[in-house]
Each structure stands twice: as structure tokens, then as C-alpha cells.
Amino acid sequence: MSETKTYCGFIAIVGRPNVGKSTLLNKLLGQKISITSRKAQTTRHRIVGIHTEGEYQAIYVDTPGLHMEEKRAINRLMNKAASSSIGDVELVIFVVEGTRWTPDDEMVLNKLREGKAPVILAINKVDNVQDKAELLPHLQFLGSQMNFLDIVPISAETGMNVDTIAAIVRKHLPEAIHHFPEDYITDRSQRFMASEIIREKLMRFLGAELPYSVTVEIERFVTNERGGYDINGLILVEREGQKKMVIGNKGAKIKTIGIEARKDMQDMFEAPVHLELWVKVKSGWADDERALRSLGYVDDL
């Protein structure tokens, strides 16, 4: 009896910051593995999300948003991670936002033109476009920019047409053995996912007040006798004022962040979690490549 053919390939999700790449990845996978926030530049590592359906396995690379400014070491590294993701994939999903077109979009497009992989153009947030009459000319403009494999208007938030993207992806996966067991959804460790969950809550509850100079280090991640996990998270900020902001009045802010992060961790790890958080000032970490290496920002470049 002949063996069933299997199909497997890597797909990069690219675009300028804050167009909805992480939301799209989470929808394609059916659960949350990439942090989402209304702030630009929330994805700092290339998260690999794995979706296996029967004989098809799609491995998604969620890049940081490519962007023009490269002043700080962390932004240079994020751009490098995004650019290197484009080079070694079977397919690219280029995410843009509604009828907006910016120099950053243009820069991403230029990088894609240099590549060999076919590109699906996903026009996100079309449900937010007020004047629908603007949409058709904009679609025609985008279609003339490059020979796209397909152009799909989507809403990553509501899931509109995300199944269309998934179907196109499946159709273009090469015949290959599956790289991961079928129950895997990410190759990232639980420790890494714990730090991402804490960072998402920081973004969510501190919003515009908090600059990007914040990161999370998991100092302890152990199983306990109750069948759950004891996790200690260290939140690193650059200035004393930021530390006070994270802690909040009488510790209220960090308590909320801890409670919400613990809930998400318990959902993800399917086990009880005991979480403790500390805040520490480590000035200049976002400018120091050595510090970034020690925090794991360049282990995947």
C-alpha cells in the first residue's frame, strides 16, 4: 500500500509594524502564540507557529515589523530578523492595512521584489475602511506594484477571509515530510512563551505610557509537586521612573499584570501556575548588543 503524501513548508508573515501580522498568525493557528497589542513593534522574536491539518503542515514565521528607523541596536536586530525570514521560505504573506500606504510599506515591498518566494498580499482591516469607494482603486494600485500570487482583503480581528489565506497556503506547500509532531503549535519553549505573555500584559496595561525599553526575563521556571509551575519573572526597564510606572500605586499595576498573565499561562500550559514578578532597572539595555544577546534577542538570527 502506498504511503500518504505529506506536504510541509515555511511561510513568512511580513509587513510594517502594527498592520496585524500577529493577530493574523494567531487566527491561522486557532490560538494565541504571538503577542498582540495596539502599539507598533510588539513582536521582537521570530515566532514559529505550526498548523497541521491532515497531510498538510504549514510553519509560520511571524517577523517583527520591518521599518525605516534603525537607530537603536534592538531595532537593527529586529529588522535583521525580519529580513532574514524572507530569504528562506516557500511563501510570503505581505500584510498591509486598509487603504493606507506608507514609505515603510514601500520598503517591505522592495525587499519582497528582490526575493524568489511567491507573495500573497493580505489587505487587513478592510472592515475599518470608512469610504468603501476608495477600496477598489487602492486594490488596483496595489495589484500593479508586483506580480502577487493572490490579493485577499481580510480582517484578522474577525477572521474574515483568513480561511482563504490558509487554503492558498495549503495549495502551495511543497511535498515534504512534516518537520514537527502534529500536536505542536510552536517550537518556542514554555519559558519563552511565559515571557511573551508577561510582555503582552505590560503593553496592554501600561499602553502609551511605557516605552519599548522594557523586556522580561524568566529567572525560574520549574514544575512543582502540585503538578503545576512556579515561575519567577524579572521585568527590566531603563529608568527608575519606568519602574514606578510598572509597579503602580501601592503595587496595583504589577498585581493586575501578574493576575492576567497567570490566567493566560494557565490556559496555555493547561496547569496551575504560581507567578512572581519583580521589576529591575538595567539602563541602556536596548542600545547594548551584548545585553540583547544575553536576553535572547539574537539567538535566532
Swiss-Prot record:
Residues 154-156 are annotated as: G5. One of its GO terms (cellular component) is plasma membrane. GTP binds at residues 15-22, 62-66, 124-127. It is found in: Cytoplasm; Cell inner membrane. The keyword rRNA-binding applies. Residues 15-22 are annotated as: G1. PROSITE patterns: G_ERA, KH_TYPE_2. Residues 206-283 form the KH type-2 domain. It is a peripheral membrane protein. Residues 124-127 are annotated as: G4. Monomer. This is GTPase Era. It comes from Cronobacter sakazakii (strain ATCC BAA-894). The lineage of its organism: Bacteria, Pseudomonadati, Pseudomonadota, Gammaproteobacteria, Enterobacterales. The gene is era.
